Regions:
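Carbohydrate-associated surface elements
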Residues: 21
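A short, well-ordered alpha-helix in the C-terminal region of glycosyltransferases
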Residues: 173, 180, 187-201, 210-213
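Short hydrophobic beta-strand element within catalytic cores of glycosyltransferases
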Residues: 143-147
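Conserved acidic donor-binding segment of nucleotide-sugar-dependent glycosyltransferases
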Residues: 159-171, 180-185
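Aromatic "clamp/platform" in nucleotide-sugar-dependent glycosyltransferases that forms part
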Residues: 107, 126
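Single conserved hydrophobic/aromatic residue that forms the stacking wall/gate
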Residues: 1-7, 11
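A conserved nucleotide-sugar
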Residues: 41-46, 53, 59-104, 187-188
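A short helix/loop element that forms part of the nucleotide-sugar donor recognition site in Leloir-type
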Residues: 27-42, 46
C-alpha cells in the first residue's frame, strides 16, 4: 500500500468489533434468587446506582441531582457499593436531609435481585470501559439514564435512542432527565424497548461466534 492512511482504511474495513460478552441468561437466573426488599414504597420512583465510591463513578453528581428534585418527585434511591468516598457521600446526604429518600448499601455479591426491584438505573461515571452494569440493567428491562462518558454508554443506549444521556458532571441536566422520565414514561418505554431489541449484539453467544470466525479465518 502506498500510504499509512490507505493501510488504515483497509484495516478499518476488515475490523470486527467484539464486545466484552454478557451472559444474559445468567443475569436473569441470578436475579431470581431470594433477596430482601430494598424499596418499601410502591408509589415512589425507585432509583438504583451500583459502583465503587470513587471519583470515577462520581455518585456525588447523582446526589446533587436528587437533591434538586426532592421537592417535586417522590423517590427512593439506593446506592450500592464501597470505597474511599463513602463517608463523603453520607456527609452530603446528612447535610441535605436526604436520609429518608436515599440509602447507601454495602457491596453485595449478587446485586441482580436488587437490580430487578428497581425502576430506573442511573450511571453517573466520569469514564468507563464498557459498563457491564448497563447491559445487566437492560437484561432485566430497566430504564437507564447515564452520563455520556467515554466509553460505552452512548453506544449501549444507541446515541440516546435507547435511554437518556446527560453531560458528565452536570447534575442539573441529570435532574432534568430524571424529571423527564417521571413525566414521560410511555415515551421512555419505547426507548427502553429499542435498547432491549439491540442488546443481542453484546451477548456472549454472538461474540463467541465472532471469535470463532476470526480463528477459522487465520487457520
Amino acid at each position: 500500500l502506498s500510504s499509512s492512511s490507505a493501510a488504515s482504511d483497509v484495516y478499518k474495513r476488515q475490523a470486527i468489533c467484539i464486545y466484552n460478552p454478557l451472559n444474559h441468561d445468567e443475569v436473569i437466573k441470578k436475579s431470581k434468587k431470594n433477596s430482601k426488599k430494598i424499596f418499601t414504597n410502591k408509589k415512589q420512583l425507585k432509583i438504583l446506582n451500583i459502583g465503587r465510591f470513587t471519583e470515577q463513578k462520581d455518585q456525588l453528581t447523582l446526589l446533587k441531582a436528587l437533591n434538586l428534585i426532592k421537592k417535586d418527585i417522590s423517590f427512593q434511591a439506593i446506592i450500592i457499593g464501597r470505597g474511599k468516598l463513602r463517608n463523603d457521600l453520607i456527609e452530603y446526604i446528612n447535610k441535605n436531609k436526604l436520609n429518608d429518600c436515599i440509602k447507601i448499601i454495602d457491596f453485595v455479591e449478587n446485586p441482580f435481585p436488587l437490580l430487578k426491584q428497581t425502576e430506573l438505573f442511573i450511571l453517573s461515571s466520569r469514564y468507563e470501559g464498557l459498563p457491564n452494569v448497563l447491559l445487566e440493567a437492560l437484561s432485566l428491562k430497566k430504564f437507564i439514564i447515564s452520563s455520556n462518558c467515554p466509553t460505552g454508554p452512548k453506544e449501549i443506549l444507541l446515541n440516546g435512542n435507547g435511554g437518556l444521556l446527560f453531560k458528565v458532571g452536570d447534575y442539573k441536566q441529570l435532574a432534568k432527565k430524571i424529571s423527564y422520565y417521571q413525566n414521560n414514561k410511555n415515551k421512555c418505554k419505547k426507548l427502553l424497548n429499542h435498547s432491549i431489541q439491540n442488546i443481542k449484539r453484546f451477548d456472549y453467544k454472538t461474540n463467541m461466534q465472532k471469535y470463532l470466525f476470526l480463528i477459522k479465518k487465520f487457520i
